[in-house]
Amino acid sequence: MKIFNVLFFVLLAVVARAADNPYNETADAKLEIKQTLTQAAVTQTPIIIVFGANWCGDCKMLDSAMKSGASATLLSRDFKIVKVNVGRFDTNVDLARSYGVPLAKGIPAVAIISPKNEIIYVTQDGELANARQMGDNGIYEFHKRVTAWSKAKK
């Protein structure tokens, strides 16, 4: 019985930890982007690609704000979202580079692309790398500016 309890709590801890990880470390990011581009072409909706990692507190803060903060309604209405794991800057780096995302400036980093896979906007100076200090309101203001800017570029 003691072994069962230990195994149960270990399994519970693993499941809880996985729930806190917004970036799928085993996902095929290129395939996810390709599939999202297909969906976006139907609705003519731009795509936000968020490059981040599960060890990054600012990445987790941004993810939380995008799911439940003031940004959530704005983003779900105007964008499709793909999250790309960059690990310890050793995963999907080529993909970030292909969208002009300078990971060295910090993560999370964002690229906004059209349904035709054309770059609309890229964070260039680590604009979201201090998401914890920005808080929900600062993240919302950033998304509001980027949304307006991306609509103007259409």
Per-region residue spans from a language model:
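Sec-dependent signal peptide recognition
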Residues: K2-F9
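Hydrophobic h-region of N-terminal signal peptides that target proteins for export
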Residues: F9-R17
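Cleaved targeting-peptide boundary
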Residues: A18-E25
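A short beta-strand-turn-helix
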Residues: E25-P46
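Thiol-based oxidoreductase modules, predominantly thioredoxin-like and allied folds used
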Residues: A27, A72-V93
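Short active-site neighborhood of thiol/selenol oxidoreductases, capturing the structured segment around
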Residues: T43-C56
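Typically the conserved alpha-helix immediately C-terminal to a functionally engaged Cys/Sec
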Residues: K60-L74
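Non-catalytic, surface beta->alpha helical segment in thiol-disulfide oxidoreductase systems
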Residues: K105-K153
